[in-house]
Amino acid sequence: MVSKIRVLGGTPLRGEVTVRGAKNLVPKAMVAALLSAEQSKLRNVPLIRDVDVVSDLLRMHGVTVDYDQEAGVLAMTPGSINLPEDSVEMDTLAGSSRIPILFAGPLLHSLGEAFIPDLGGCHIGSRPVNFHLRVLEDFGARRIQEAAGMHLIAEKPLKAKPVHLPYPSVGATEQTLLAAVRAEGIT
């Protein structure tokens, strides 16, 4: 890797550069498509691995995903949302991303249950999902630890409530937003 770059000025830059969308936002916006029965479209979608992983996970849950990579347009149409029957394929996808935990809130709203496989995808150290689970439990979900992951059940519609995290967590905040959007009450 280059340790420094030297930039020499004096010549105006000309031309055009196409910049694709925010790589950290798009996978979460894709998960949010589970919150509606209507088609969701994202434009300016970047060509990143997480888009492929989330597309595959959405398809496994019954969502039709059409991605025009050249145009950068991604259309997601929820059909009959369901829990995947193939936990092996889901495990394979989960091993390359931490996104599956964010499916929990939307699936609890749509199905009353969610299965979250053991998660991978992090090279910066341990990043437990206990804050995610606490938010979902505070909203009324119940969790059952299974050999392959976590089964979450909401026997009644989720109920929003104030959330206080012990310290800032981007993922738990995203989970809170995805779970609270259709929950009864105010978060």
Identify what each model region corresponds to:
Residues 1-187:
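Structural preference for solvent-exposed beta-strand-turn elements
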